Amino acid sequence: MELISLKYAIFVIALLVLYYCFPKKYRWYVLLAGSMAYYVIICKWYVLFIIFTICTTYGSTIWIDKLLKKQNAIVKSHKEDWDRQTRKEYKEKGRKKRVAVMLFALLCNFGILAFLKYIPYAGELGLLLPLGISFYTFQSMGYVMDVYREIVEPEKNFLKVALFVSFFPQIIQGPIAIYDKLANQLYEGHSLRLLNLQKGALLVLWGVMKKLVIADRAVNIINFVMDKPMDFSGTYVFFAAVVYALQLYADFSGGIDIVRGIAEMFGITMSTNFNHPYFSRSLTEYWHRWHMTLGDWCRNYIFYPLSISKRFLNFGKWLKPRFGAHISKVLPGCIASVITFIVIGVWHGANMKYLYFGLWNGIVIMLAELFAPVNKKVAGGFFKLTGLREKGIFATIVSVLWTFMLILVGYYFDIAANASTAFHMLFKSVTDFHIGELGINNIILNLGACGLDEYDILLLIICTLLWFFISFVEENKKLDMRDFILSRKLPLRWAIIYLGIFIVIIFGYYGPGVNPADFVYMQF
């Protein structure tokens, strides 16, 4: 049951009807039944993996809570006869017990994920990667860690925990939800509101447009060049990398738009996963705009715990008298950042190329932080000398283009078959680049065998420019295009909606002879 298919549309509509027909207090049962049914339909017996995650998530959070309450009760009962040191020692013993329970849940779930994703023997045993396992594992283990940290109260209802872990729209490719932002929305039972249906449907339409019109058309160029990248000039290797940046963004954000739109029809607001990332002026800013829920998860559960740990704080103190205040303040956080990006890289796959992907991003950000004072002085001198404004149009364009080039280097490791090929592709892109080869006629001549003709290339360019124009307006005017459309008079509103449907039907890349491309992040 593909995300963009008639079967899935019928499933969602049927579930919507059932959801709003039931009394409010029972509506979450409909979501749970629909979510589990959906997972069984698409994954068959692999549903056992998500059931295991549900059970360990529920059991560990309840256990942690019981240990904490028992500890607090005993400490309270000995308020008069225990001194401060005794209370401290007892609490430390209790904390270690709770850590053990948390680690048990983490090791069980991340262990299964690692075995299925990174150990070759899993494939030999006939075990495939269960759909969405990375996403629901990260989400549920984040909840376990939040309970341990006493950020949230554990949910006592097993079925409600099951719904939080398995909510069907996000199971394929996220977004990765934080418990206290999503859980209550799932359980409360929402009223039927026309505005939710309208805004959700518009977001779904927008996601389908990005996927079918742009992403599935662009993927032909990428597959064609990456099949034998050394047979092409550096110009077309670079061109394929740029197209990949476009295709990945259209594919992933399109899928997330569909997911968020469906959730919104049920009255549920899911976290934003993209915020116009290619308008970023630095790599750090990019990672705050791209795959935002994964970035938030890694910051909350890897970066911050590392950077404020005793070992890292002591390292900072050791650095201060030797290298000065700036290095002592920044370097520990930079090392934590590099470790975090290594985890992000490895999350994408077991191939060494993903390790290099993580290292590239982490090291570039680390160098930017370490040399920030120097960069600031150089930039300040440049702007003073030229009379240009630091936040003017010229500076913004240069910053955005430079950041995009840094992003693009990372993508070489993503699209190449392996790390060695990625390095060869990078070298070729620098030493064998000829801008004259980027004319449409030359592109058709050299890449025509990929299955796209001049019409497809022009359509890809026009639709991409339209997409980025809309994104530019949203970015600069702080405008939600859906609110803009729904605020228009009825004839214009429907004209825009019908135009979107027309674009999908007429210009969508599907039909006889076309192999539909899966969403990229389904594989994770």
PLM regions and their residue ranges:
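Membrane-embedded transmembrane alpha-helical bundles that form the catalytic cores
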Residues: 1-523
